[in-house]
């Protein structure tokens, strides 16, 4: 696949990202369902963490319809620099200065994940090296939601596109999309049968509900 292209610009919003994919079959299910992007997890200790050989296999099998996004948590320079794709998602406690350094070192385009806090959202919206904000629950990948009603008044004031994560699943995503009209939605545990194992029927149901 071409890893140098831009993040997919969907013909109809929201963009749908399925995070924590681990197998070629997961990729096929995401592409068949109509997802736009997939998240490959490099976070130590996560049930979705990928070994280097698994990453190589997934990149080789990546459908052209999907944009791969690497998810890092406070990464070391060599790890983040080795990612061959265009986009990374920083999901740790990276400071604004660290994000600037990563952007300068790697040239990667950056999605910054933020546990919802109004002041933090406004501050990261002004960061010149962050292109997309991903607003999450208290603990990424846990399925814990945040107060969407508290975010709603902020959205119109933000300059950057916003992806909503945290507690989404096929049963809840449609209401969130109707209420917030975000650029994108992100799901991980909400489309799993067990921790770290994607349920392909739930992936299809999630994409259908998000776009419905």
Predicted segments with their positions:
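Conserved N-terminal beta1-alpha1 strand-loop-helix module at the mouth
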Residues: 1-212
């Amino acid at each position: 696949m071409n890893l140098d292209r831009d993040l997919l610009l969907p013909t109809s919003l929201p963009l749908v990202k399925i995070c924590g994919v681990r197998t070629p079959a997961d990729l096929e299910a995401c592409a068949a369902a109509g997802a736009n992007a997939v998240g490959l997890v490099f976070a130590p200790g996560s049930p979705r963490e990928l070994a280097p050989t698994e990453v190589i296999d997934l990149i080789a099998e990546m459908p052209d319809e999907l944009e791969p996004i690497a998810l890092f948590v406070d990464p070391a320079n060599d790890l983040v620099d080795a990612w061959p794709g265009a986009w990374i998602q920083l999901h740790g406690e990276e400071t604004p200065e660290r994000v600037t350094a990563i952007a300068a070192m790697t040239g990667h385009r950056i999605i910054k994940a933020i546990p919802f806090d109004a002041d933090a959202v406004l501050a990261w919206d002004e960061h010149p090296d962050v292109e997309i904000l991903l607003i999450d629950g208290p603990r990424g990948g846990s399925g814990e939601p945040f107060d969407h009603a508290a975010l709603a008044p902020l959205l119109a004031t933000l300059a950057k596109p916003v992806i909503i994560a945290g507690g989404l699943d096929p049963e809840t995503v449609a209401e969130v999309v109707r209420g917030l009209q975000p650029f994108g939605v992100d799901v991980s545990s909400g489309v799993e049968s067990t921790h770290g194992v994607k349920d392909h029927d739930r992936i299809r149901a999630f994409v259908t509900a998000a776009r419905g």
